Amino acid sequence: MALRGVYAQLLNRGPGLRVFRSWSSATAQTEKGEKTQSRSAKPSRPEFDWRDPLLLEEQLTADEILIRDTFRTYCQERLMPRILLANRNEVFHREIISEMGELGMLGPTIQGYSCAGVSSVAYGLLARELERVDSGYRSAMSVQSSLVMYPIYAYGSEEQKQKYLPRLAKGELLGCFGLTEPNHGSDPSGMETRARHNPSSRSYILSGSKTWITNSPVADLLIVWARCEDSCIRGFLLEKGMRGLSTPRIEGKFSLRASSTGMIIMDDVEVPEENVLPGVSGLAGPFGCLNNARYGITWGVLGAAEFCLHTARQYTLDRIQFGVPLAKNQLIQKKLADMLTEITLGLHACLQLGRLKDQDKAAPEMVSLLKRNNCGKALDIARQARDMLGGNGISDEYHVIRHVMNLESVNTYEGTHDIHALILGRAITGIQAFVAGK
């Protein structure tokens, strides 16, 4: 379904959304009128809006703004009310995937197969709005779009695309991506999961385990990477219910609690030959998927950082100590200025990367640069905001501590902060330093 059409439908669903539309229009008209009066009263002078310091809005297309505003409304009105208890109780709401599917937000950059076919920037804007609410929700969407739908689209057969992509796009199926193993995180080349070919049954027998897999306990479709007898790594499509396949949940997380995380355990799981992804072999396959997912993360974490900035700003304006607002303190203003600076620079870098991505000019190192920078800066901002809220900063009702906990994970997964430093170091020097002495 076209996202423009979805936007029109969403706005017509209820009075609350019509109020949002009216408020947005009225606000825009009021601001326009104020600016007009200001220009007539004195010579024209560029105005600074701290909410959009370098005019990101002016660099987006009308469609991108429309898509973002649609999803922002959904996130704030449908997801934000759920997240407090979901995080407290460590509950993943499966229905949000179906809801996002109805909005056309799953696999949105894919052309055809019931997908929206929007720009990479539009996808980034979606990730930003989703992670403004919670990193766990963004993780679920990111896995579905970049780690499940993308490899089927990029490496799958036409039969696989027709069979799975439309149902994944609608949220009827939920997928997961199995690469990380108990003994192999940053070094997937040491993969121990094995796939033995059985010519007589035209199938592969998979044995091994994967861990820290987002969505695995509730997944209908599992993309698993395994080493074949020729030592080549290939991707396999496993379906829920296959004999020998289990996906136990990992309990007791203090991060991404609104996301379902688990293992994939394969005890001689028989997978038909037609379930092998034919278009890729070797680590280029999973790395290509991760590159797409990391791009979404670069946008998403800034949404979380923006939430923390806005919360800290309002709190320090409202909180009176020693007879004045905390925001009157020079140290507080410096912290807010530092936060705003890093978020602004990060967003404009994301915009440039998105445009390059749509032109097929985005090198993996570019993504590593922003994944490393934006995740690290977002975590720093969340920690600062937590501190600025004082004792209230550890209360989940203010949401900032939840973002701190979540960003600790996001700074680690899909390439740790240090691994991305080594990727960039190799690009700078021409020398790989992943293993000392090699």
From Swiss-Prot:
What is the required cofactor set for this protein?
A: FAD
Q: Which reaction(s) does its UniProt entry say it catalyses? A: glutaryl-CoA + oxidized [electron-transfer flavoprotein] + 2 H(+) = (2E)-butenoyl-CoA + reduced [electron-transfer flavoprotein] + CO2
Record: active site: E414 (proton acceptor)
KW Cytoplasm (keyword) present: no
What does the function comment of this entry state? Catalyzes the oxidative decarboxylation of glutaryl-CoA to crotonyl-CoA and CO(2) in the degradative pathway of L-lysine, L-hydroxylysine, and L-tryptophan metabolism. It uses electron transfer flavoprotein as its electron acceptor.
Gene Ontology biological-process annotations: fatty acid beta-oxidation using acyl-CoA dehydrogenase; fatty-acyl-CoA biosynthetic process; L-tryptophan metabolic process
User: Mind telling me what this protein is named?
Assistant: Glutaryl-CoA dehydrogenase, mitochondrial
> Quaternary form?
Homotetramer.
The record's Pfam families line, in alphabetical order, gives: Acyl-CoA_dh_1, Acyl-CoA_dh_M, Acyl-CoA_dh_N
List GO terms (cellular component aspect).
Answer: mitochondrial matrix
| Annotated pathway | Amino-acid metabolism; lysine degradation; Amino-acid metabolism; tryptophan metabolism
Task: Give GO terms: molecular function aspect only.
Answer: fatty-acyl-CoA binding; flavin adenine dinucleotide binding; glutaryl-CoA dehydrogenase activity
Listed A to Z, the keywords are: Acetylation, FAD, Flavoprotein, Mitochondrion, Oxidoreductase, Transit peptide
Provide the positions where the record notes the PTM N6-acetyllysine: K240
Binding sites annotated in the UniProt record for FAD: 177-186, 212-214, 319, 330, 387-391, 416-418, 434
InterPro entries membership: Acyl-CoA_DH_CS, Acyl-CoA_Oxase/DH_mid-dom, Acyl-CoA_Oxase/DH_mid-dom_sf, AcylCo_DH-like_C, AcylCo_DH/oxidase_C, AcylCoA_DH/ox_N, AcylCoA_DH/ox_N_sf, AcylCoA_DH/oxidase_NM_dom_sf
Its source organism is Bos taurus (Bovine)
Disulfide bond entries: none
